[in-house]
């Protein structure tokens, strides 16, 4: 019976295990089998206790495993959340960086493509107006000016008070000439060299160097513009009208935008000028005129001193100039100035002769007080004097200009640079005003050269130059007085 029962139990157990394996319940094998066996062999209670403990251990183990898995899953979720959070933050950072780069990308690209140049130091303001002549004194050299001062023809201070400031646009217009009918194929350099050479060959250049600074050619319309360094040389350059260049006869004219000074030629243009010059005490004779000068060109030369009352250019039967003319100024006091300024002037290959046409006529109100024979505190009745190493430049600066430290330094630099072109400059002195105390030599510029010959070259070159719209007057100065700072 026991064996039969045991066989039945084994059969039941086998069937149960098959079902358990099929349902994935292998763990129940150990639980069921001991219980059945314990019931059969009488040790059921003890085995049940052990089985209960085993089940509890397995449950605790499974609970621990499940807890471990839950904690791992939780940590994994936390790690994934943190990773996703970091990824989102990195994406936001990259997005912000891209937006920032886009906003400033243009500026950054410009900086990368075009690196900023280092800031250049401020260049000193150029104070150079050497070749801008004051109205009424365009053709007067310092020596002629001294003679006018000695005769009392120009009052003290009249140069500065009578000279309006010339704007740069007016100055540029007055220094340009139109050149028409230019030959095909000519270039700017060739034309520039040609006119500069002609200016020197005809003795029309007033200083060393090239009188013409710039040439601009319009090949499509067959004309050019040339720009001179001074107004005087520009007027003289009009004498080249009709000159032959590379087989072509050039047309030299004033540009359309040219406007003469309002205080001179414009006044004369508004008032009719008589073609008959009657005999009077103020009638002047102008001889030695180049035959190629037209009536308008001669009138323009005379009008640089003031408006004309009457003018007559003597011509032959064919209308060609005979080389002399007669004129009278609207203001009789301008007669002496024009004579002193024009007489002996070199114009082309000829020298002008300007004098009173009626010497026996009695003149009225043409002489000025003798006290007017000084300018800037120096007697101009004498010439430049004996040549020394010291050159004194007068009528260049005013007290107001010397009071400003910035202007004073710029004047010093400008004068030194210009004088260095003619020789070695050892020292330079420009006396400055001091409060209300009188300072000897204010308004004069003293330049010490290395040699007397250097000083003579500078005197010859700077004579008649213009500085700040003022005619520069030159004179040699005693060496001992200069070194002792006796500038009176």
Swiss-Prot record:
Residues 25-133 are annotated as: Disordered. Gene3D superfamilies: 3.30.70.330. Residues 175-257, 282-359, 389-479 form the RRM domain. Keywords: mRNA processing, mRNA splicing, Nucleus, Repeat, RNA-binding. Belongs to the splicing factor SR family. Necessary for the splicing of pre-mRNA. Binds to the polypyrimidine tract of introns early during spliceosome assembly. Forms a heterodimer with the U2AF small subunit. This is Splicing factor U2AF 65 kDa subunit. It comes from Caenorhabditis briggsae.
